[in-house]
Amino acid sequence: MKYIHILLVFIILSLFITVIKSNYYDNNNQNQNQYSYHHTYNNNNQGNYQSKNVHSESEQNSYNKETRNNNDDDDDDENFERNKKSIRSRYHGYTYRNDQIQSRGNSAKGGSYSESTYFTLHSGTDRYGRRNDYSRFQTRGRSNGYRENMFLNVFDVVGNIKTTRNKRKITKSEKNGRYIKKDHMNNRDSNTNINEKPEYSKSPVFQGGYRSLEKNFTTNYGNSSNASIPLSGKQSQL
């Protein structure tokens, strides 16, 4: 019962911190959202695609056509005009800085690779906060693919416990390594236990059930100049 109460306290605290975080972002980051790619201004229904001097779609189309016609001959002038009088705001949602595209604001559609979500139960992401294509959650944060600095929730705790258990499991190769490291008679030059038999009793390396001490046998069988087992008569004739 004590662990159940502790679990409930974790869940309540996670939800409480989530509400605080979401309210903080909603109240203090509106200026960040206004430059988002999908944001639409409320003032005179001016969209994010419109320039400052154009107030209707027809004027916008004519402005774009005129700009293209006037600058067809000179690519440098065309790029200069597009940068100077862009159909988007200069501070739009994807700003080029240091040859990298930085996404500002939030985007519920494709193009946002940020990891933080507003919810503890983020069914649109995996347990690390990485979004799926069908996610419609509002997201914030850096674009490294993992949820960071958000809050401690029960799912992360359970996941860490499971990961720790998996690390404690011994793989097959590790078991073989432990077997080799044990003080077995096959890894020793002699054995004090008379009743213990070698694993490979017919091996020419062993004499009387134990490793031979008369010759300096090696284990480098791949090198013919350092072969440990003498060739038989038939093999030497070949």
Curated annotation (Swiss-Prot):
The two FS800 proteins are read from two overlapping reading frames. Residues 35-112, 166-204 are annotated as: Disordered. Residues 171-187 have a biased composition (Basic and acidic residues). This is Female-specific protein 800. Residues 97-106 have a biased composition (Polar residues). FS800 is likely to have some function in the production or maintenance of the schistosome egg. Residues 35-50 have a biased composition (Low complexity). InterPro entries: TES (IPR012615).
